[in-house]
Structure formats: structure tokens, C-alpha cells
Amino acid sequence: MTGSIRSKLSAIDVRQLGTVDYRTAWQLQRELADARVAGGADTLLLLEHPAVYTAGRRTETHERPIDGTPVVDTDRGGKITWHGPGQLVGYPIIGLAEPLDVVNYVRRLEESLIQVCADLGLHAGRVDGRSGVWLPGRPARKVAAIGVRVSRATTLHGFALNCDCDLAAFTAIVPCGISDAAVTSLSAELGRTVTVDEVRATVAAAVCAALDGVLPVGDRVPSHAVPSPL
């Protein structure tokens, strides 16, 4: 998995945004994807959302909020998750090189966030059969979720890194459809407040490095993580 996964050589346009409504950001992604297909730049959006539940194409009825809380149904992969204040969301709008390798792309996103955790002193990694970034334990704890879509060789949607968000928001759903694992945050793991602003620049640099092959993908599986199929 060395070398760039991108079809363009020019630098990724990193846009550090503030708090953006989910539907507004989704429309911006589509516009940037259209521009990328027409020959425009690769873009990385980094932002926060107001509190919202979003459901991927594989979400089942019993995984939705039991109290009837509204959910935005999306065209990304994966199942239901929560976005909100204290969570850094990243949307890479990237033209992928041929031959397309979506698994490779997801692994690079994971690697970038694993590196961010390492820079903060956390030994994170992967759990076999499950996307995202995990901390070891019984159960394993997910600190970052990933759900993507690739259309016309261009990526949409992306990742969400829990910094200092309210983890209680995840209790109303079955996060990512996984009932035998937990959700955590950088702040909960480190015992101090880790804000979104603290990690913005580090995340941007790591994602760009991973997509360009400067940060190689390693075989990082936390010890004591319990793999099980989706």
C-alpha cells in the first residue's frame, strides 16, 4: 500500500471549517465531487456538526433511536452513528487512482487516525472485520468511525474522530450496528480535555500523508482487541 492512492499529484486542498449543518455539508461534498470529476482539486473538509444521527445504507430498524429521534438517511456505507459537538469530522473528496481499491483507501484513513492517537500517547489500532480505529480492551472501544462512498472514482463521506464529545448520545442507538463493543473519546482515554481544535492540524497532516503514501499502512491490531464479524 505504498505510493499515492490519488490520481492527482497536486496538493490536497484542506478546508478547516467550523460547525456545519449535516445536510449542508453533504451538499457541499456533492458539489466538490462534481468539480473533482470535472478536473478540479482533491479536497479535505474538516468540521463539526450540530448533534445529528445519520444512517448508512445497511442500517436496520432496531438499530435506530428507540425514542423516535430524527435520523438523516445517507448514501454512505456502514450503519447508524452520531455526529455532534466535540467530534472532528473529515470528508476527503478525492479522485482515486486506477485500479480502484476502496479497502486500501479505508485502511489509509484508519492509519492516519491511528497515527494521531499515537501522537497523543494512545496505542490504537484495528479490529479484524470492523472498520474504524479502536482501543484495546474487553470490549474494544471505538474512538473513530469510518463510512465512505465512492462514485465516479471519487470519494465522499469519511471519518469521525471523538475528541471531547458527549458519549451519552451513542446510548440511544446501536453505534455502527455493533452491539458488543463500546464507544470512547480521546478525552475519556487520556483523562484530560482534547478539543477538536487541538487535533485539527495533526489530523489534516496525517490524512494527507496517508493518502499520498508518505505514512505507510501498518498491521496495527491492539492487543486484547476481540475480533468478531459484522
Curated annotation (Swiss-Prot):
Summarizing the annotation, the consequence of altering residue 176 to S is: Loss of activity
Please provide, alphabetically and separated by semicolons, the GO molecular function terms listed in this UniProt record: lipoyl(octanoyl) transferase activity
Pfam families to which the protein is assigned, alphabetical: LplA-B_cat (PF21948)
Origin: domain of life: Bacteria
Q: Which UniProt keywords apply?
A: Acyltransferase, Cytoplasm, Transferase
**Reaction it catalyzes:** octanoyl-[ACP] + L-lysyl-[protein] = N(6)-octanoyl-L-lysyl-[protein] + holo-[ACP] + H(+)
For this protein, what is the EC number? Answer: 2.3.1.181
What is one process in the GO biological process aspect for this record? protein modification process
Write down the PROSITE patterns for this protein, in alphabetical order: BPL_LPL_CATALYTIC, LIPB
Q: Where does the BPL/LPL catalytic domain lie? A: 38-215
Q: Which residues form the active site?
A: 176 (acyl-thioester intermediate)
Give the matching Gene3D superfamilies: Bira Bifunctional Protein, Domain 2
Q: Which InterPro entries does the UniProt record give?
A: aa-tRNA-synth_II/BPL/LPL, BPL_LPL_catalytic, Octanoyltransferase, Octanoyltransferase_CS
Q: Name the residues that bind substrate.
A: 76-83, 145-147, 158-160
List other remarks: In the reaction, the free carboxyl group of octanoic acid is attached via an amide linkage to the epsilon-amino group of a specific lysine residue of lipoyl domains of lipoate-dependent enzymes.
How does it associate, per the subunit comment?
Monomer.
Give the protein's function: Catalyzes the transfer of endogenously produced octanoic acid from octanoyl-acyl-carrier-protein onto the lipoyl domains of lipoate-dependent enzymes. Lipoyl-ACP can also act as a substrate although octanoyl-ACP is likely to be the physiological substrate.
According to its UniProt record, which protein family does this protein belong to? Belongs to the LipB family.
* Protein name according to UniProt: Octanoyltransferase
Phylogenetic lineage: Bacteria, Bacillati, Actinomycetota, Actinomycetes, Mycobacteriales
